[in-house]
């Protein structure tokens, strides 16, 4: 966009909305898309705008079978809005755009821009080109043009941040289309990662989550199998960084040096999300998961030996082609043995373009649903039992923003414990801010949250809370600009159980 057009955009405050679907990597990319648009002179549309913006960007997911229907349904709802709003533009990016390309404009000719996973930095240019030429711009790159972390960013929080350490994936899981859309794994330089973290901490961020499709394969580019554990230890030496998390590792690459680094680095949190996908060796082989049940449970045993307080969660697919009742019972057995704090269970969804889509033995939906309900019931009880063990414990909870839907009605606040469990607690007499740390005693446990009903034992104001206060005060005084931070607090939330395995799954 030319300087004249940029000035015009600022003068009339052209607005934008970014809608994000799918995994944490997409959320990370959407922060960059927002930063790019604000750098081009757009301002963020108010919450609840529901498409009432000058530019609406869809950052799509291609994992679920109904991802296409969801996108085109939403695009269809915007079509009449566009006819009533002169100059409105619609852009579609992400994995579904990378996959479908020309199909999107054929099915929704009112779309102005289609871009892929490798060229998100081109969005402002493509929007301007579409405006000037008055025709749709479709540009899909086949390889990464710029590491997303180098792009302008508009983060949503002043106290917690995603930090991407790699993009792409070298695995060939038969159910997953993501490697074909995100490309081969490409690692970021360790020095660049640490420099970004240090800059974030200087801005007030106190928690970071290292992000990649397969984080513990980090270093494969240079042949250093211990690069990820070294990175964790390096994070432990950054003054002011209180909490470090990561997502998601692959069991194949989960080595003892990583477990040691987790246990020996105080600011690496006692939490592990490691996708199992199935407990059946037969199904794991069909999935090309390159580990078996014994190996997976062995990793969990080692993690718990090193960190007895660790909360371990996972992803599981039910109804993969060829899964027998015996195979499913092996998954149930593995869940009983592992005793996950949480498990995100998904009904298998056929994705065109994946080997699993053409496999024999596709399971009837009613069978998949019945197994899914059995597994969900088992995990619900285990989650509750594991949470009950927290009652009576004293925990340091980092105050969150927007985590408790009922906080206003219950006069409580919410936050995350070190192991990432959600805690609702009584408001202390002293005012606290997101990013501050409150020490509480747990009095009650539910399957998906903990409750601390007594007066908090201590409140610690933090630089992160200061940063949030400064950010909030500044936002009230002037339009939002390019910020540092992250949506939400704690590790990025996994997809809801109704969804599908995320791109970040190992």
Swiss-Prot record:
Primary location class: cytoplasm
UniProt-listed SMART domains: Elp3
InterPro entries hit by this protein: Elp3/MiaA/NifB-like_rSAM, Methylthiotransferase, Methylthiotransferase_CS, Methylthiotransferase_N, Methylthiotransferase_N_sf, MiaB_methiolase, rSAM, rSAM_horseshoe
Record's cofactor remark: Binds 2 [4Fe-4S] clusters. One cluster is coordinated with 3 cysteines and an exchangeable S-adenosyl-L-methionine.
Signal peptide coordinates: none
GO molecular function annotations of the record: 4 iron, 4 sulfur cluster binding; metal ion binding; N6-isopentenyladenosine methylthiotransferase activity
EC class: transferase
Domain MTTase N-terminal: 14-132
Annotated CDD domains: Radical_SAM
Subcellular location, record wording: Cytoplasm
EC number per UniProt: 2.8.4.3
Residue sites binding [4Fe-4S] cluster 1 per the record: 23, 61, 95
Residues that hold [4Fe-4S] cluster 2 according to the record: 169, 173, 176
Catalyzed reactions per annotation: N(6)-dimethylallyladenosine(37) in tRNA + (sulfur carrier)-SH + AH2 + 2 S-adenosyl-L-methionine = 2-methylsulfanyl-N(6)-dimethylallyladenosine(37) in tRNA + (sulfur carrier)-H + 5'-deoxyadenosine + L-methionine + A + S-adenosyl-L-homocysteine + 2 H(+)
Family annotation (PROSITE patterns): MTTASE_N, MTTASE_RADICAL, RADICAL_SAM, TRAM
Similarity comment text for this entry: Belongs to the methylthiotransferase family. MiaB subfamily.
Functional note: Catalyzes the methylthiolation of N6-(dimethylallyl)adenosine (i(6)A), leading to the formation of 2-methylthio-N6-(dimethylallyl)adenosine (ms(2)i(6)A) at position 37 in tRNAs that read codons beginning with uridine.
Quaternary context: Monomer.
Database matches in HAMAP family: tRNA_metthiotr_MiaB (MF_01864)
Name of this protein: tRNA-2-methylthio-N(6)-dimethylallyladenosine synthase
Gene that encodes the chain: miaB
């Amino acid at each position: 966009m030319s300087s004249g057009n940029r000035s015009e955009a600022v003068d009339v405050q052209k607005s934008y909305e970014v809608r994000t679907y799918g995994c944490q990597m997409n959320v990370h990319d959407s922060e960059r898309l927002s930063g790019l648009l604000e750098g081009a002179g757009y301002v963020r549309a108010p919450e609840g705008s529901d498409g009432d913006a000058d530019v609406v960007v869809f950052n799509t997911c291609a994992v679920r079978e109904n991802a296409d229907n969801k996108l085109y349904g939403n695009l269809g709802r915007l079509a009449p809005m566009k006819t009533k709003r002169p100059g409105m533009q619609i852009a579609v990016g992400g994995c579904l755009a990378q996959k479908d390309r020309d199909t999107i404009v054929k099915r929704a000719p009112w779309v102005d821009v289609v871009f892929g996973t490798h060229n998100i930095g081109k969005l402002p240019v493509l929007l301007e080109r579409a405006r000037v030429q008055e025709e749709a711009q479709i540009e899909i790159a086949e390889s990464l043009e710029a590491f997303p972390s180098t792009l302008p960013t508009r983060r949503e929080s002043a106290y917690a941040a995603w930090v991407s350490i790699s993009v792409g994936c070298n695995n060939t899981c038969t159910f997953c289309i993501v490697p074909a859309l995100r490309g081969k794994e490409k690692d970021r330089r360790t020095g660049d990662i640490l420099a970004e973290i240090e800059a974030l901490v200087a801005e007030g961020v106190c928690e970071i989550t290292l992000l990649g499709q397969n984080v513990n394969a980090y270093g494969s580019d240079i042949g250093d199998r211990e690069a990820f554990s070294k990175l964790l230890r390096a994070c432990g030496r950054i003054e002011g960084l209180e909490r470090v998390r990561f997502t998601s590792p692959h069991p194949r690459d989960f080595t003892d040096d990583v477990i040691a680094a987790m246990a020996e680095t105080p600011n690496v949190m006692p939490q592990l999300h490691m996708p199992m996908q199935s407990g059946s060796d037969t199904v794991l082989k069909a999935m090309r998961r390159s580990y078996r049940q014994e190996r997976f449970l062995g990793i969990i045993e080692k993690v718990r030996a090193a960190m007895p307080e660790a909360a371990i969660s996972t992803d599981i697919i039910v109804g993969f082609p060829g899964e027998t009742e015996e195979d499913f019972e092996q998954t149930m057995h593995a869940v009983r043995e592992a005793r996950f704090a949480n498990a995100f269970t998904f009904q298998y969804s056929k994705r065109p373009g994946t080997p699993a889509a053409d496999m024999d033995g596709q399971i009837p939906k009613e069978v998949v649903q019945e197994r899914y309900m059995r597994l969900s019931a088992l995990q619900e009880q285990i989650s509750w039992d594991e949470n009950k063990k927290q009652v009576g414990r004293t925990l340091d909870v980092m105050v969150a923003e927007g985590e408790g839907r009922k906080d206003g009605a219950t006069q409580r606040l919410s936050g995350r414990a070190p192991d990432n469990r959600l805690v609702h607690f009584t408001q202390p007499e002293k005012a606290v801010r997101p990013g501050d740390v409150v020490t509480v005693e747990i009095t009650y446990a539910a399957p998906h949250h903990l409750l601390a009903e007594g007066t908090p034992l201590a409140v610690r104001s933090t630089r992160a809370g200061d940063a949030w206060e400064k950010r909030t005060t500044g936002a009230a005084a002037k339009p939002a600009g390019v910020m540092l931070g992250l949506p939400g607090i704690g590790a990025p939330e996994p997809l809801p159980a109704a969804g599908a395995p995320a791109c970040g799954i190992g």
